[in-house]
């Protein structure tokens, strides 16, 4: 999550107001998106913004993951994939897929374990790359639900201004991999939502065999 008023005036407070409430009740794991990386790689335009933002995450004891994996109790692994700016160009000037090999370069894949693997990837990408790496759950967002949604058609625009994005919001499955794309809370590029309610996704993980909650 990243909230700013504009690229000339930063205002992190709405974001951290929510995060402060979340950390009171849950462990929070944070992955970068396109806004964070824009601050990170364009220091001249946003001097000190990224360092300030990351420092605030640390103050709240939020686990900030960048192309890394951590193993939790109960056989759960959480990983985060950090996508570079080539994935976020406007119109057709952006990558829309990620290969199984690229995924393995960014996160730990253990083919010999039965652990449940959750991957945070800001932009929802092709599910086959994750499925081939036996990743169980991918949590994404970025598309803001397509901003404008039409009956029987679905999402109209992506933030890259391409039309009819595939993974615009909801649940998608390929083999044993599930991808959830949240419609999120804010707007992007076109400051408009039409037939597209903001949302926070709540996931309950349940063991397949004995129907007991994992977390």
Predicted regions and their residues:
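Conserved beta-sheet core of the metallophosphoesterase superfamily
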Residues: 124-202, 209-211
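Short acidic-hydrophobic surface loop/beta-edge motif
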Residues: 67-73, 170-175
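Active-site neighborhood of phospho(di)ester-bond hydrolases with catalytic His/Asp-centered motifs
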Residues: 1-3, 27-34, 65-67, 118-121, ...
